Amino acid sequence: MPYGTRYPTLAFHTGGVGESDDGMPPQPFETFCYDSALLQAKIENFNIVPYTSVLPKELFGNILPVDQCTKFFKHGAVLEVIMAGRGATVTDGTQAIATGVGICWGKDKNGELIRGWAAEYVEFFPTWIDDEIAESHAKMWLKKSLQHELDLRSISKHSEFQYFHNYINIRKKFGFCLTALGFLNFENAAPAVIQ
């Protein structure tokens, strides 16, 4: 029996950072730092598959903190994510990394929720930062990106934008920072019927 495409109905938000004095070329921050960031984000035992940034309306109100979802995690499972994550080397002049994910929801002419989008943010800083800087920069750039996604589609904003962010001040040679949405539950759209 055929079935249609899958779409997520339950998600969680999370974030993590990692740093190390060790790493393997060509991207040394991908080795140990990335694993440490996944561990801190509590998603280290998944096989991560990245998405682009389109959200079904069924996710509205169903995006939870990661700690509410960990009891449902399955070691070795595939976790589909929207992730803002990057690494850096301090010898390249980066002292801090900030990341964020923002969410917007659109409405139709009657004010009804129709669909959503996400946007990712990554910024490198030549000096250490604090949470206030990380949050303000994430919101500033994500707000611009989310509004662009709505404007591009000629869709009005349904509700307030949501923002999640994270940052690291790199104290070792290499660092990695990530903010992510992970998708846990799914349903299927109706299958296509071609006559």
Curated annotation (Swiss-Prot):
Keywords: Cytoplasm, Decarboxylase, Lyase, Pyruvate, Virulence. Binds 1 pyruvoyl group covalently per subunit. It comes from the Bacteria. The record marks T52, S53 as: Cleavage (non-hydrolytic). SUPFAM superfamilies: Pyruvoyl-dependent histidine and arginine decarboxylases. Its EC number is 4.1.1.19. Coiled coil: none annotated. Its main location: cytoplasm. The modification Pyruvic acid (Ser) is found at S53. GO terms for biological process: arginine catabolic process. It is an enzyme of class 4 (lyase). One of its GO terms (molecular function) is arginine decarboxylase activity. The keyword Hydrolase does not apply. It is found in: Cytoplasm. Trimer of an alpha-beta dimer. Part of the AaxABC system, catalyzes the decarboxylation of L-arginine. The arginine uptake by the bacterium in the macrophage may be a virulence factor against the host innate immune response. Belongs to the pyruvoyl-dependent arginine decarboxylase family. This is Pyruvoyl-dependent arginine decarboxylase AaxB. It comes from Chlamydia trachomatis serovar D (strain ATCC VR-885 / DSM 19411 / UW-3/Cx). The gene is aaxB.
